[in-house]
Amino acid sequence: MSSKGPVQPPFAMTVSAEARAVMTPMLKQEPAPEITAMLMRNAITRKAVRAAAANHLKPLNKDRAKRFGVDVTKGKIAGVPVKYVRRKGTDAEADKRLLINFHGGGFMVDSGSLTETIPIAGLTGIPVVTVMYRMAPEHVFPAAVDDALAVYVDALAHRPPGAIGIYGTSAGAVLTLQLLVRIKAEGLPMPAAAGFFSGSGDLALAGDCEAYLPSILGSRTAPETLADYCVGTERTDPLLSPVYGDLTGLPPMLLMTSTRDQLLSQTVLADLALRRASVAVDLRVYEGMMHAFWAWIECPETEVALAAQAGFFARHVFA
């Protein structure tokens, strides 16, 4: 640690030139987590931040949709706003299977409802519904889980559980695991498979990597960053932090992270908790890459990660 902040190590030799180009400006940012939190707690500035994020992603997602050959429409399921993403040319037969996505963004911003779904719908041919769940600070836990559950229950009404998969990145991964323990608590059948990509199952304690890996969140850990989401709930409540509960009976899971992901430790700790519960897990750790790097489709490493995600769901989700 220097007087100017964390010392940034050189890139791993295996990291592509494209990934280096993406990561370099991120590492040069001067994060101001306290200011960010203040902006999100004010209704006017919060609206502006969310609008700016949407405007930034709009042209990128338009290009992604063209590249992966998908159509995107909006709708509602069980009263919950959603986006439907499906590969062009698919017929009603494709609807026998469904993937449900929960976007990232710290439970405060939509940073991935299309970046996380367009590639998977295009690669697998399985329609994807991304849930536009209620976000903090307006809506705290368990509002997002309630919305996720409502969409899942509707999916069960139209197809068997073996034809459904769920997944998410970052906050969406947190929500994925929270939904699974909620499904178990409600006595509902489990989906065929779940993807937990760069997330956390523990909102009470920070992981080791959060202490030293560079992040646009600055020095804030996952428990600190998600404080507004957790208001009013004991941090070790198993429905909020699933690693403190009984994880037996959960479906096969793919876990994904990278060695410069601030949530590397949290993903590994979730993997250990799932293994202790005899859940079939596949943990993929990618060398030298940043948090949720699969969102940057210009990186060769992303092609590898997306192929792993798509292959996992293709193997486990059957009509």
Per-range role (PLM):
Residues 1-90, 319:
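A glycine/proline-hinged amphipathic helix-loop "lid/cap" segment
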Residues 22, 26-30, 35, 39, ...:
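Alpha/beta-hydrolase superfamily serine-hydrolase fold, recognizing
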